[in-house]
Amino acid sequence: MLTLNTKLEKADQIDGELILPYDQREKSRLRATMVSGEDVAVFTVRGTILRDGDILRGDDGRIVKITAAKEPTYRVEALSPHQLLRCAFHLGNRHTQAQIGNGFLRIRKDAVLKEMLEGLGAKVEEELAAFEPESGAYGGGHHHHGDDGHHPLAPIPLRQKIHRPSDKAE
């Protein structure tokens, strides 16, 4: 089985394509099937989120492009920027992942959230689309110009460490 574990900034050729919904692109360990039918194992450092268009190199040197799968979502539009901002506020208040587009929000399909958004005056339509939510306040995703563009997948600190009583003081 092909193992994908190195992220590249660019590649001269693509040897395969792996189409994944968002919930699988945020997993650090994953077994999946490429478009060709070949099984692959994806190993990333915990906290890494694969984005549409990311390129991974396999243990045998092959290059695989990640494509965001179309999945059931809601497209949220409003009559004014203020109204859309209110919708974004209430979604964030519920810790709901949201994609921010030009004049719209996109969220995963959820009937309760749809009812809330419609109650705020938003137009909510079902849409089969790639879901690319914001990475959050602690998300990374930047790179430094001048690097060689080849690096093992590294963690993106999406969440702060939660200290539990059982954690030993250092």
Curated annotation (Swiss-Prot):
One of its GO terms (molecular function) is unfolded protein binding. It is found in: Cytoplasm. It comes from Janthinobacterium sp. (strain Marseille). One of its GO terms (biological process) is protein folding. This is Urease accessory protein UreE. Belongs to the UreE family. Residues 134-170 are annotated as: Disordered. CDD domains: UreE (cd00571). The keyword Iron does not apply. Keywords: Chaperone, Cytoplasm, Nickel, Nickel insertion.
